Amino acid sequence: METATRTHQQRKLISSFLDITVNQTVEIATQFLEATTWNLEDAINLFLIARRNPHHHHGEELVPLPLPSKKNTLYDYDPFMSHNTSVAVCPEEIWDDESTSEESDSRLSSLYRPPPSLFFHGSFEDAKATSSREDLWLLVNLQSTTEFASHLLNRDLWPHDAVFQAIKSSFILLQVYDDTSEGQKISTFYKIDSVPPVVLLIDPITGQKMRMWSGVIEPQGFLEDLMKYMDSGPHEHVASLTSNKRMKTEKISCSSNNADDQDMATFWGNAIEEEKTVIKSGKEETFTSDRVVAPSWGPEFEDIMTLSEHEEETCLSCDLLEFPVLTEEPKADCDRSVVCSICVRFPDGRRKQRKFLKSEPIQLLWSFCYSHMEESEKKEFKLVQAIPGASKTLDYGAKATFDQSGIANSMISVTWE
């Protein structure tokens, strides 16, 4: 059984090695992994060093095969069982390498190193306490050093501009590995059966798992899912649950008092019947209390009504505003370096996403929002950018581009004036 497990682990490491190095053979992958006692990171770095070595003769293989390592130990060493350690592994250390003097940005491994400033550095309990104290949702990323999808998450999801900003503003992100005691505790407690990578959204106050993603996660879909939790923090969520329970209790209490209310209604009905009188107007016209006599409000009330109508016209004056014509959205094959993506959240909860050229004026964002409003909603509105620790109201009169204004690849909320 133990031999079968080891063989399965080795096959996964070989597969990951081939995915990263590209166009290499199983034999080369096996030799490099064996030379580094089946350590994927060391094997890849050794492969890169060997490939860059200029001292090879014409006709020889481009990648020289490494010599197998030899070690003398006092006891049998099992590389797969030795990963059971209580020491947490920092995510940025997985791809760190001090075995070569080459610049980190020239190594293939630098592509798979996640942004260290995005992650919480500490234990799961510390992350939960900090999230609760700062009223932020807790995201837990369970990774695996042997699953290539985990490295893809570090390369494609966490460095994504919009995802990075969303997490910084409303979440705390903890990354742990499944071969540590911390990762195993989380897997057991939340009954995670999926193969890493797995991302959990946790209420830090109650510890409840609110949402889970697994496998290769696309940034756009992940961002849309996160935005559902950015309108309110965990404290407001718990307060709403408490409020719902209180409302149910009040309904039960109200139903028990219905009989008393009916008795009071009967009492007042009888009293009204007894006090029916004949009302005579100046023209001697007769009315009874069964008929409602409309009061005369006088000119003062008419002035107030006129003022209210004027205010309503002012609120709807946005209909007269002319926004610039919305340009055509950049195509998918457009150069990504000149394109930005904006996600807009409307007051009714709808979310729309659109791409703009970074060189285009930000006034087009008002045009985009206005085009997605119903006729009954078209009134004065403002656009607010959610940034960590504060919010920024955008200025329509500012003559700036998306790139100059700093709102490229961000989330914008529409609020009524």
UniProtKB/Swiss-Prot annotation:
GO molecular function: ubiquitin binding
GO biological process: proteasome-mediated ubiquitin-dependent protein catabolic process
Pfam families, alphabetized: Thioredoxin_7, UBA_4, UBX
InterPro entries: Thioredoxin-like_sf (IPR036249), UAS (IPR006577), UBA-like_sf (IPR009060), Ubiquitin-like_domsf (IPR029071), UBX_dom (IPR001012), UBX_domain-protein (IPR050730)
Keywords: Ubl conjugation pathway
CDD domains hit by this protein: UAS (cd02958), UBA_TAP-C_like (cd14273), UBX (cd01767)
N-terminal signal peptide: none
Record carries keyword Glycoprotein: no
Gene Ontology annotations for the cellular component aspect, listed alphabetically: nucleus
Residue span, UBX domain: 335-415
Transmembrane helix among keywords: no
Record's protein name: Putative plant UBX domain-containing protein 14
Protein's organism: Arabidopsis thaliana
